[in-house]
Amino acid sequence: MNIRTLEPDDWPALAPFLHAHNVASARCLHSHTGTTAAAYRQELAALAPDEACFIIAEFEPSCAGVMGAEFSLESKRAWLRGPVLDATLSSAVATEVRDALWRRLSDVLPAAIERLDGFLDISNVAGLEWYRRCGFTEQAHYFIYEAQRGPASPMMPDNVHAAAESQHASLLELAHLVFPSGYLTDSELTAANNDQHVLLVMAEGDRVDGYVYANIANANTDDAEVYVDYLVVRPDARGRKLGRTLLQAALSWGFSERGVSKAALTVASDNANAQGLYASVGFKLFATGVPMRLDRGANSIKTTHSN
């Protein structure tokens, strides 16, 4: 078996393999970037070379498996992709390939990364068991919802707007209050809106009562979608339908302004109120995700063959 760390120019070539094998009961949700090889290829090509890495396992001349990660040095976190394996591998060989990929990935990830997060479909039993054997702990589950654009796209509410610079302090205070371990950095939350992402707020003066952050995934492909990363309402402002209004704003931006035909979001499995909101505007359950987490320490990284 040959293990290689890929150069960024080689990442898009992984698309056909990932499209073929990241499916059904073997799915890694961090790796799921669309329903076509073209969507995978475009997303891989768009990754920042200094914020990701990919490892490939080969039994010449064929690819046996892929594992990678996106990472942020600012937040000291990495979001793992895979391992995604050739579905024809035996159980014993699959374990060998997973271990080899993990050993190399552990070596090439920046030493500054302290927290590693995997995210597998709940039906990926073999993958989840492997993560547990490597020392990862299972976190609370999440539901992934999807919605299709209807014949009439929602209008942008008049009381929703981009955050002013004077509102950034309140915005960040709210983000840290509600999602202290959120994956978006302060600089990402306060960056200027563009064609790829938007952050919109509802506020009274400089006090932000709620915000929504959304991005366009797989732009310019048939799998383009508006993904709602965060929908946040200040605890003492709840009950005023701010969440519904902010969600409408995100869908208006994605459907009307950016012209995509699909939306997606993730919600905690125990957040019944949010699930009810999403269902009421047409979102349907796509998958149940199981987060797996490892905080790196001197002895925290191991493989299934470690004692």
Residue ranges and their predicted role:
Residues 122-140, 244, 269-287:
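Conserved active-site alpha-helix within GNAT-family acetyltransferase domains
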Residues 29-100, 212-229:
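Conserved donor-binding loop and adjoining core beta-sheet/short helix segment
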Residues 85, 116-127, 264-275, 292-298:
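Conserved beta-strand-loop-alpha-helix junction that forms the acyl-donor binding cleft
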Residues 18, 22, 28-54, 179-200, ...:
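Active-site rim helix/loop that mediates acceptor-substrate recognition in acyltransferases
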Residues 2-18, 158-171:
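A short beta-loop-alpha structural element at the N-terminal edge
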Residues 91-107, 133, 230-233, 239-252, ...:
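Conserved acetyl-CoA-binding loop-helix of GNAT-fold acetyltransferases
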Residues 186-253:
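Glycine/small-residue-rich hydrophobic helix-like segments
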Residues 129, 133-174:
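Acyltransferase donor/substrate-recognition loop-hinge adjacent to the catalytic core
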